[in-house]
């Protein structure tokens, strides 16, 4: 869509045209026409009632489209007394993103929809009108035009009523068709497309033919077209036209005119004796349809046919004949030189216009036998042998094709057994082969001989391996088969205890759910905006509760219990930079992408402009603390937009810190956030037990004591429900691995849960030390002994090695060599249990623990 600048609206003047009509009921004056005039232009634009106009909106690139229903002047308006009543159309980008899939297809480039919503405000100011457009109504079975150059032509096929797309009502369709017929300025886009499809080369040919007519033709009626040229006819003429060579161009209409005219100018064109071969192979149609270049007795037939064709076709159908420059010696040419476009993307060159005449044709026919007589006999023999070879290759390839298609077992006959008499008869009956360059002939012969040497096989060829397609579409890998279901009770429990599994209900948060639901519902019913701050430690169900509220509100909106709204969710963890939140909101709101600054400006215009928002928007901002910046402009805008009356924006923010507004926000930001706040307390052990039982309903995989143990353990530490679910899932894995009979696994006991809790709450360093070898554990004890002896938390490898040897002697173990101890030190350093200097220092490199000494002692203690 073209960019309609809204900055020029202030330099336009609007005035009424015609005498006013008084409305007796509403007591205001109505008009039938208005005019728009810009100060820097002298022209005026007149718009009448019933026309379609563009109206200034939020997006300057996509203004609103409407039909003028009434023009009137209302004295009760303070700012703009010139008013208009319109019938709105809606673009596809204005449809909510969550409902765009209801169309069921890809919308057209210039497609709009009849907006069937009586509650929408249709009273606008005349000063918001940008200009007039054309709207064409299409039947449901008509095809939407593609690639239109006129961006001010729109097409409508369906209507939109905020719920679904429907076909246009019959009365609306008839009304739009009547308006289309009344508009005389409307032109069908297909005609413009046909006109624009004409190639410039045909226009140049037309000018050349007209120039030749003015000089040589006596009758202009032969060259006048009686009907327009269609692209299909032009393509057919191109296929049957003469081959194009770089230097000479001739049109059949012009040549026929020159043949018919008795008083034509004499031109003597002499050709060289040796004709250079053409670069292209001539088609068979050219050899049979143009024998006049070789047979002088058929010149009259050519002249007669050209005369007939000139009466039927227009000069645009002029066929082009080009001859190579080295093959011509021009003695007398026309004084006028034209700029001839060369086809195929070559550079254009200035060449003289040459017209073939009967005299020239006779002279050429007379010279051809001389050239053939002067040619040596060896060339004729070579030409004959090449013709025979090509004929044999053709027969063999034809035989190979027939043998592949037929399944009958036939005996293979080589090409050498074909009789010479048959080849001579074929040579006499077939048309002469086109002249080619030696390189092209030898290349074709090599490729043909290579195919002829292949013996046909009765067994089918191997199927080719699938290759990467040329135009591959990137996509995510998908399964060919569905995922296998759970095979036992433990697998079923593991699936239900997953964090991503959606439970049937959300227990233990009924009060918080009701408070959030009432807040959002009141804003939707009042069509106003507001903010709510939700805080709580991780894993307390904040985001899950809000999702449940939105799901229930969407179901209520479908049942017409609450007004429809648009839901958008943004997570601060998924943003690379805080200002990218504008880009995400704009993309989910309108489906467009823009830079951060441009998106912020568009959103501010949408939420702060009067009458811009059509429905309420509910915005969920998760991880709000990650949107903090030095100027705090992002938080300020998110909390300031809902304060505007026209915004209809409800913002729900979620963070982990309860005192976040007072701790990191400025006063001007926290004051706009308001006092509507909610805190999610950590789960108690009874609530965690209820959550586990609700997920494990009808699945007996845990002992009652085990569930009670894990609920109390997690509630005492953090109250995180996600941590509780992860511990239970790990306990099911431990129970499944420890069971002797996989087919009949037992229940998850308290021992399994204690083991899972130890893994979950213990450090990975402690686990690594416990699972290390005896030599590695002895080396760690030597490090602790050296630290205790020196009083420092750093020692050289040589000092640690002395302590290591002493400990091995005390325990009666064979102490390792220096190299073995060096390898042990390097391995512990690779595991990041030690911080070791590079090995170039050898025994003097320093060693330091990467974990605390208490953790090492706890891991090395004997159980």
Swiss-Prot record:
Q: How is it modified after translation?
A: Phosphorylated during mitosis.
Question: Residue ranges of region Disordered?
Answer: 186-261, 274-315, 401-482
User: At which residues is Phosphoserine found?
Assistant: 199, 255, 258, 276, 290, 419
The terms under GO molecular function for this entry are: ATP binding; ATP hydrolysis activity; chromatin binding; DNA replication origin binding; metal ion binding
What family is this?
Answer: Belongs to the ORC1 family.
What are the binding positions for ATP in this chain?
502, 536-544, 623, 656, 722
Task: Report if keyword Magnesium is assigned.
Answer: yes
Q: Which domain of life is it from?
A: Eukaryota
Which residues lie in Acidic residues bias regions?
419-428
Q: Which Gene Ontology terms of cellular component type are present?
A: nuclear origin of replication recognition complex
- Keywords linked to the UniProt accession: Acetylation, ATP-binding, DNA replication, DNA-binding, Magnesium, Metal-binding, Nucleotide-binding, Nucleus, Phosphoprotein
Look up and give the organism this protein is from.
Bos taurus (Bovine)
Protein name, UniProt field: Origin recognition complex subunit 1
Which of the residues bear the PTM N6-acetyllysine? 329
Q: Which PROSITE patterns match?
A: BAH
Occurrences of domain BAH (ranges): 45-171
Q: Where is this region: Necessary and sufficient for ORC complex assembly?
A: 503-863
